[in-house]
Amino acid sequence: MRTPYNPNQIPRVIIIQKLYGKFFNEDENLTFPKHRFKKFIKDVVNGTIERNDLITEELETHLKEDLILTRLDKLFQVIVKCAVFELLYKPKTSSKIIIKEYLNASNF
């Protein structure tokens, strides 16, 4: 019998939660849970924070003129920024996997 999914244990859900707290709740205390993918989670969270301005610039160059990133849903902003970070700075992971997993994480 398969164990049920616990969305709080899925790495990209954890990444989204941490970054949402950092960007929108001004959560300065970034602690990372014990997890088998802890290094990956920390890399993506810290990398997205460090490169936030570059990621935002990149996104804004691809948005239509009537779309402003800061006017989009906050959760959507975080998901897109995480995905863009991975697509640009984690080339070992297939883009199909990155997109699929962030789409799955957005369903939780």
Where are these regions (language model features)?
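N-terminal interaction/assembly modules
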Residues: 1-108
